[in-house]
Amino acid sequence: MTRTQSYTSRANPKGSGYAALGGALATSRRYAANEMRRLCILMSAARFRFYAELNDFLPDESRGKDLTRYFSAGGSVKDFVESFGVPHTEVDLVLANGKPVDFSYPVRNGDRVSVYPVFESLDISSVTRVRPAPLRALRFLLDVHVGRLAAYLRMAGFDVLYGNQASDDDLASIVARERRVLLTRDRYLLMRNAVDRGYWVRSTEPKQQLLEVVKRFDLTGSMRPFTRCLDCNTLLEKASRESVLERLPPKIRDKDVFRLCPSCQRVYWEGSHHERMSKLLRWVKANVPAPPVA
């Protein structure tokens, strides 16, 4: 027997073994595909469509199109919406087969569900079933992901708690107890049932975040710049130069206008930092579109 013949005689059984394995795998794949088709026929199905900026939460291939979800057991429309990665706090209107529903609506076989974000220029208060009751005044809670934004919002005069050391459970509890709006970059935090008001901040740059939030909540007319302590959020009080003189650097003692935080005793005056922050607020206001003419 030649060397080639000897090799061939040993190789052929091995080759036939691989062929058998390949055939078995192909059969297994066909079986799995057929089984999946059979299950899809037996299971219920509903179609979902997300509009406008809600597509930010979807993968590129799922944006702007109908998405079919198969299910064997029903669930609330809130659960289905969040299974796509969209927090319920981002949703302002849900239509099931063309009719407004709330988040507890049980999704059924054949349902066509349309999910909309906040409407900027259209009043849908008489239609929506998912929007929480309006707040008398907007108060915010920010987590560790948006710390610089917390300082900017306080600088603009808004009541802002900054939970940089708080757990997710603590943050959700504060939102529910104090009726605050949660601002975060963590979409899954917004999916907690206790969080009924919140917003997922898209931008990662703090100044753009400030502009984004001012636009989203229409805050331009509510700004009260330099009225809150940047450290502890307390409202500032006017202070005479004499009352704070000992706390001032020598080059600041010729200033006339001072504010004092009654809580942490920090003193504020109109220096270079004040001018930079004023410039930032002017930039924000200049980049907020004017309201539509009625």
What name fits each language-model region?
Residues 229-232, 261-264:
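Short cysteine-rich clusters marking metal-coordination/redox-active sites
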Residues 2-10, 28, 255:
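Low-acidity, Ser/Thr- and Arg-rich intrinsically disordered low-complexity segments
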Residues 246-257:
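Short linker/helix segments within small regulatory modules
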Residues 89, 100-103, 109-224:
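Long, charged N-terminal interaction/targeting segments
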Residues 226, 258:
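Residues immediately within or flanking Cys/His clusters that coordinate Zn2+
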Residues 37-139:
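Ubiquitin-like/PB1-type beta-grasp interaction modules and other compact soluble beta-rich domains
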Residues 234-238, 269:
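Short functional micro-motifs and their immediate structural scaffolds
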Residues 239-242, 272-274:
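Short Cys/His-rich "knuckle" micro-motifs
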